[in-house]
């Protein structure tokens, strides 16, 4: 019979059995090696109160610690939450990890289409005065 994935959707090579975990979203039982695992990094203090806490802090430059929680998702919840995406038959063979998300200021700034200089006669140039006689 044909098979869809080389690993059968699991990371269990050579093991007979692995323990089950509960999905963090729906509490469904899922094998630990099949579950989609991610670290959720959050601030201890919510975004609205960060400045108030830093102003009230005695130490200058104190960095608030973060909460690191490992979340496990079953396949259906991971697809629904766009943590993983359904890929075509050809793209399923691609075993490279997906491209990492980079913040806007970390991206390389290359030449943009249309050039960086303002066009002559654009919005910044004053309109010619034709009413003179």
Curated annotation (Swiss-Prot):
Higher taxonomy: Eukaryota, Viridiplantae, Streptophyta, Embryophyta, Tracheophyta
Gene (UniProt): RPS26
InterPro entries: Ribosomal_eS26 (IPR000892), Ribosomal_eS26_CS (IPR047864), Ribosomal_eS26_sf (IPR038551)
Example GO biological process: translation
Protein name, as recorded: Small ribosomal subunit protein eS26
Pfam families xref list: Ribosomal_S26e (PF01283)
Signal peptide (from-to): none
UniProt entry keywords in alphabetical sequence: Ribonucleoprotein, Ribosomal protein
Composition skew (Low complexity), residue ranges: 120-133
Annotated family: Belongs to the eukaryotic ribosomal protein eS26 family.
One cellular component term from this protein's GO annotations in UniProt: cytosolic small ribosomal subunit
Biased composition (Basic and acidic residues): 87-109
Residue numbers spanned by region Disordered: 87-133
One MF annotation (Gene Ontology) recorded for this entry: structural constituent of ribosome
